[in-house]
A protein has these predicted regions:
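Single conserved hydrophobic/aromatic residue that forms the stacking wall/gate
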Residues: 1-7, 12
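A cross-kingdom feature that marks ATP-driven nucleic-acid transaction machinery
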Residues: 14-183
């Protein structure tokens, strides 16, 4: 049996993260402070971690969970496309002349169709703005026709946003509870 500890994201620029969440947590938070922790100051080290640092870390892990959910949904035939390729997209937005990214991409290589998603591990955010940016980013993923847009969030979206998404027919909301519903 082989285990992959380090994974390279499918993207334009090289990015390596530990595929195993335990190793990732250890090398991100424990190893830099191992002397303090072993010296008995573990509680102080933990209390010194800001909500922002933990939120950023959990946000990256949340993206991975969302991608895994898309894979499982595709295998079960519950996605609107038959996706077989999963990952992220990073690159330059020529209109803004800056780096941009798409948190999750699920693609059907045969039909050249894909869905893209934004993953928000925050208590609140501008839902309309996030959806507008997601639609803009569809033009950045070259070689695929983006047909569906997913907004993954820690908490449920507002009723107004959910109503707009349902009316669009191509936008879907997935909450943390939804991610674990079929397990």
């Amino acid at each position: 049996m082989s285990a992959s500890l380090v994974g390279s994201e499918m993207c334009i620029r090289d990015s390596y993260r530990f595929a195993d969440a335990c190793y990732d947590f250890w090398y991100t938070f424990v190893m830099p402070a191992v002397g303090d922790i072993e010296g008995g100051a573990g509680r102080i080290v933990a209390e010194g971690l800001s909500d922002e640092v933990l939120g950023t870390y959990l946000g990256h892990r949340f993206e991975r969970v969302c991608s895994q959910w898309l894979l499982e949904e595709s295998l079960a035939g519950r996605l609107p496309i038959r996706a077989s390729s999963f990952g992220q997209w990073w690159g330059t937005d020529p209109a803004l002349r800056q780096q941009d990214d798409v948190d999750v991409v699920a693609a059907d290589r045969a039909s050249k169709t894909a869905l893209i998603g934004e993953c928000k591990w925050r208590n609140s955010f501008d839902e309309t703005e996030v959806l507008e940016k997601l639609h803009h980013r569809a033009d950045l993923v070259k070689g695929y026709r983006i047909e569906f847009f997913y907004l993954f969030s820690k908490n449920p979206l507002s009723t107004a946003t959910l109503r707009k998404m349902k009316a669009s027919g191509d936008e879907f909301s997935v909450t943390l509870d939804d991610l674990y519903r079929h397990r």
